[in-house]
From Swiss-Prot:
Keyword vocabulary terms for this entry: Acetylation, Membrane, Phosphoprotein, Transmembrane, Transmembrane helix, Transport
Location(s) in or outside the cell: Membrane
Classification via SUPFAM superfamilies: Multidrug resistance efflux transporter EmrE
Reported function: Putative solute transporter.
Protein name (Swiss-Prot/TrEMBL): Solute carrier family 35 member F2
Keyword Transport attached: yes
Ribosomal protein recorded as keyword: no
Chief place where the protein resides: membrane
Top-level taxon of origin: Eukaryota
Length: 374
């Protein structure tokens, strides 16, 4: 009888156990990296914003389909009025450099441009639906994400890693899956009256949203949330009010008001007000780019609600799309970006705090630096 080899017949067992241990260790590392408290908090905050957007979309569609009310500028005007009554008035009662009059004296023209970008971004996207298709709006609206990343690179000095570009690509793949599901479900019935004009409006709106979001991130992290909301409320009310009188006065006059229509307007205004109030808080602890990736799921929430309210057809691709978008969002949040200081800057360096997921810490350190200088 031949003797067994020194390793014996059980030789593969240690190898198998070692491979299993390595795989288990890899899973633990992945879990520890992707499912931290900061990432879970970011996901929850992003989906809260998505639900606010879903609320605005559902109420607008209900007004349009059930009551033939198409007044996007009036709806935005009500939101800006709420921002004015809360945050602009708050600035008026502040003292020192945070006072409303002091801010207007130093930066009035900048906030006029910001208010114009914000108002028109909301308006042109809604108007685009009259000219182009749902597919075009959903796909071209994603154009704002690379524009936002480019603006963040040059204005906020954000520096991205390869994983961030992969994550964005994954999110856009999820949007493509959602669009495919819409086509298969028969939601692509309207071919639009002038597709080219509609597509241009979508690209313009996406770019204006990107500009507004970058300005919002800068103001929220460098100045204050109240200043951003107060100034947007002030100039947004003025600009949207003027535009309202020019483009929608006939539509408003033709509305047959009742308590149901009024309730839908109130619901829209509350959802939009919550969106504007909470988005700066989320951007403060993350970034404008990560927020825009997180709210890509808003259309899916609207679709799920539409299954019951508007009789949409369900497709398993919607679930797949939601999963893909969330995977991309988690990937993006798993690795922090960094902030590169400009070559010449009079501001004390804060490169060690230049991380998206540490927005709150950034403000604390800036305040400490300011106190030390004083």
């Amino acid at each position: 009888m031949e003797a067994d080899s020194p390793a014996g017949p059980g030789a593969p067992e240690p190898l198998a156990e070692g491979a299993a241990a390595e795989f288990s260790s890899l899973l633990r590392r992945i879990k520890g990296k992707l499912f931290t408290w900061n990432i879970l908090k970011t996901i929850a905050l992003g989906q809260m914003l998505s639900l606010c957007i879903c609320g605005t979309a559902i109420t607008s569609q209900y007004l349009a389909e059930r009551y033939k009310v198409n007044t996007p500028m009036l709806q935005s005007f009500i939101n800006y009025c709420l921002l004015f009554l809360i945050y602009t008035v708050m600035l008026a009662f502040r003292s020192g450099s945070d006072n409303l009059l002091v801010i207007l004296k130093r930066k009035w023209w900048k906030y006029i441009l910001l208010g114009l970008a914000d108002v028109e971004a909301n308006y042109v996207i809604v108007r685009a639906y009259q000219y182009t298709t749902l597919t075009s709006v959903q796909l071209l609206d994603c154009f704002g994400i690379p524009v936002l990343m480019a603006l963040s690179w040059f204005i906020l000095h954000a520096r991205y890693r390869v994983i961030h570009f992969i994550a964005v690509a994954v999110c856009l793949l999820g949007v493509g899956t959602m669009v495919g599901a819409d086509i298969l479900a028969g939601r692509e019935d309207n071919s639009g009256s002038d597709v080219l004009i509609g597509d241009i409006l979508v690209l313009l709106g996406a770019s204006l949203y990107a500009i507004s979001n970058v300005c919002e991130e800068y103001i929220v992290k460098k100045l204050s949330r109240q200043e951003f909301l107060g100034m947007v409320g002030l100039f947004g009310t003025i600009i949207s009010g003027i535009q309202l009188l020019i483009v929608e006065y006939k539509d408003i006059a033709s509305i047959h008001w009742d308590w149901k229509i009024a309730l839908l307007f109130v619901a829209f205004a509350l959802c939009m007000f919550c969106l504007y109030s909470f988005m700066p808080l989320v951007i403060k602890v993350t970034s404008a780019t990560s927020v825009n990736l997180g709210i890509l799921t808003a259309d899916l929430y609207s679709l799920f609600v539409g299954l019951f309210l508007f009789g949409y057809k369900f497709s398993g691709l919607y679930i797949l799309s939601f999963t893909v978008i969330m995977v991309g969002f988690i990937l993006y949040c798993s690795t922090p970006t960094r902030t590169a200081e400009p070559a010449e800057s009079s501001v004390p360096p804060v490169t060690s705090i230049g991380i998206d997921n540490l927005g709150l810490k950034l403000e604390e350190n800036l305040q400490e630096t300011h106190s030390a200088v004083l």
